[in-house]
Amino acid sequence: NNLVINSLRNIPNAVSNLLNNNLINVHCQFLVDEIKRKNIENMFILGSGKLFSVAKEGALKIKEISYIHAEAYSAGSLKHGPFALLDNKTIVLLLVTSNNKEKLISTYHEISARNTNCYVLTDIDLDIFKNKIIIPNINYYEEILFVITLQLIAYTLSISREINPDK
């Protein structure tokens, strides 16, 4: 399929555009500043489908280089695990695409109702999400941009906590 091949060819440009996008960098820094300001030590990253694996990679990177407790969960298992731990000292990062938005809108409302800090990493702009980082939509292979953005958040968090991310 030409669309799949063209999307694959466009990945280097999409990654470059992502990393050089000032708005994305500002929103990542805002998230990091909130974590630091609120002295948050727990983070849950929720994804579904392919983005569950992305959530696991993001949680691992955050733990490894910023020393913040981060766990990944399938968005569908929220009520079977971390839901009981949600409070205003926790941050939840939802990974939302056009493919899973219907399911995750209700999850977003459930999290917000618990007075939990909820941020959305997404490739679609929906007004319903208050705090969001919008990354480019590249049709296929979007999980690559989600992983890189989570790595950027982990790196920025590490630097803000004065931790050398290369150790």
Where are these regions (language model features)?
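A SIS-like phosphosugar-recognition module
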Residues: 1-167
